[in-house]
From Swiss-Prot:
One of its GO terms (molecular function) is ribosomal large subunit binding. Pfam families: RRF (PF01765). This is Ribosome-recycling factor. HAMAP family: RRF (MF_00040). Its main location: cytoplasm. The keyword Cytoplasm applies. One of its GO terms (biological process) is cytoplasmic translational termination. The keyword Hydrolase does not apply. One of its GO terms (cellular component) is cytosol.
Length: 186
């Protein structure tokens, strides 16, 4: 493995960690409605679990209400049940062939709990990025040991990887700060 391959691998894997964080943060409910909140809710469809977005049209009615329009009318009850049983704390209302999902206002205590969850997700992402840095540095040390690169090249590559790590950690901090602000906004 060359220095460029090690750097590229670290960069790709760090980007995946960042993407995972973004997905995890999008699942955390804020006071506002957004269609992405139902993305990970699974509904039983002909014996197999599928995301709600594949069996229904999910739209925003207003800042606090989501409308779910099933493609097949009989699916309405199953979708309503799946949303109610999800860990999101939502209480969907059936309107015949469609479902309204009002977003309850978050209490101050719930907001604080959610910010702790957000910080935890951010810390997990930072740990993942730092572990990737460590793996990349170990790979570089192995190249030096096998006399494939000089110690100067190793130091330069380690500096590159450190800059990459710093950039990703800064991006993680930015995402966490944005999400916390979103949660704490009443």
């Amino acid at each position: 493995m060359s220095v460029a391959e090690i750097r590229k691998s670290a960069e790709t894997r760090m980007a995946k960690s960042l993407d995972t964080l973004k997905v995890n943060l999008s699942k955390i409910r804020t006071g506002r409605a957004h269609t992405g909140i139902l993305d990970h809710v699974q509904v039983e469809y002909y014996g197999s679990p599928v995301p709600v977005s594949q069996v229904a049209n999910v739209n925003l009615v207003d800042a606090r209400t989501i409308s779910v329009q099933p493609y097949e009318k009989p699916m309405a009850a199953a979708i309503e049940k799946a949303i109610r049983e999800s860990d999101l704390g939502l209480n969907p209302m059936s309107l015949g062939d469609s479902i309204r999902v009002p977003m309850p206002a978050l209490t101050e205590e719930r907001r604080r709990d959610l910010t702790k969850v957000v910080k935890g997700e951010g810390e997990d992402a930072k740990i993942a990025v730092r572990n990737l840095r460590r793996e990349a540095n170990e790979s570089l040390k192995k190249l030096v040991k096998d006399k494939e690169i000089s110690e100067d090249d190793e130091r330069r590559a380690q500096d590159d990887i450190q800059k990459l790590t710093d950039r990703n950690v800064t991006e993680i901090d930015k995402l966490i700060t944005q999400k916390e602000a979103e949660i704490m906004t009443v």
